Amino acid sequence: MLKNNKRFLPKLIKYKKYSEKGGYLIPFENVKKRIALGNNCPIKIKRIFFSSAKKNAFRGDHAHKLCSQLLFCVNGSIKIETIFHVNKKKNYYISRNKNYALLLPPLVWSKIYFKSKKSILVVICDYKYDNKKEYINNFDQFINISKKKFI
């Protein structure tokens, strides 16, 4: 059992964004030491996907057993509702205008709301896609697993 292990808490991470000539660049790399130009990705990059939805629609509504994810918004604004350590809840907000990404460790239930008409979410994962073995789609099952791990 783990009690409030910080490794299993969602965390906002500031990243560098470079703007010039009417555009911007956000580099992420897997390196042992932070270099001057890029952002050191806090997880190993195994998979990347993009997601969008209509304004006020949501995606997610699940947790992962093993996968950590780094979520950042490249257009619009996004709200992420999280539940972790059985019953702790916290909302996070990320947007194109703020240079923060959200690190979601395993065993965090998340529901992602697209707050703008053209919001786009980029997700970096440290685990391959495996819906049957890796996803927790049932909230009661998530609570039971969390109780065993954190209480």
Regions found by a protein language model. Give the residues of each.
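Non-catalytic, conserved peripheral segments adjacent to functional cores
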Residues: 1-100, 117-118, 124, 129-140, ...
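Well-ordered alpha/beta subsegment
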Residues: 97-101, 107-114
